[in-house]
């Protein structure tokens, strides 16, 4: 499934990104995280940098952005990219998002599993991710899928105090 254009499930498809998707990813992260957590434009700017870096450095052999949709409606997304800061053969899971209307049907789990399968298929040794302690649903899924919390650190990247978390899964 890692290299295919679209992977079908019972109620949604996972497809590779197309032109225009990065703008949608930035928009939905900005709007949704503002509504649910009160996060500001600094978060939206961070997401914009991640998506711009994805486009600038995209290596289709080792990286993917999957879009989940149903009947053309955006339901969620996730990225798997090379961990360019690492000296080992690691990947990073980035920008997992599931729309409120698509929660509770296994979409988040499907997106994470798609990353894991692809990472194994292309030979990564581990997947790392960074999240925040306030994102309980995502943290629950990461734990269920085999990720281990390896480090926490308080930060103010968004202009207020949060606890960042580094998670990792060995493949």
Regions found by a protein language model. Give the residues of each.
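Conserved N-terminal entry element of GNAT/NAT acetyltransferase domains
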Residues: 1-23
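Generic serine detector
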Residues: 10-11, 86, 101, 125, ...
């Amino acid at each position: 499934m890692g290299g295919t254009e679209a992977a079908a499930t019972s109620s949604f498809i996972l497809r590779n990104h197309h032109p225009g998707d990065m703008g949608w990813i930035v928009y939905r992260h900005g709007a949704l995280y503002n509504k649910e957590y009160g996060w500001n434009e600094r978060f939206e700017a961070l997401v914009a940098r991640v998506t711009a870096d994805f486009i600038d450095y995209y290596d289709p052999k080792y990286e993917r952005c999957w879009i989940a949709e149903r009947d053309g409606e955006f339901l969620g997304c996730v990225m798997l990219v090379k961990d360019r800061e690492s000296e080992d053969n690691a990947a990073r899971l980035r920008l997992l998002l599931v729309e409120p209307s698509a929660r509770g049907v296994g979409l988040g789990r499907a997106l994470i599993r798609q990353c894991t399968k692809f990472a194994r298929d292309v030979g990564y040794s581990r997947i790392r991710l960074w999240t925040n302690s306030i994102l309980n649903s995502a943290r629950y899924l990461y734990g269920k899928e085999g990720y281990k919390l390896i480090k926490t650190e308080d930060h103010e990247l968004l202009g207020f105090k949060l606890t960042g978390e580094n998670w990792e899964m060995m493949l």
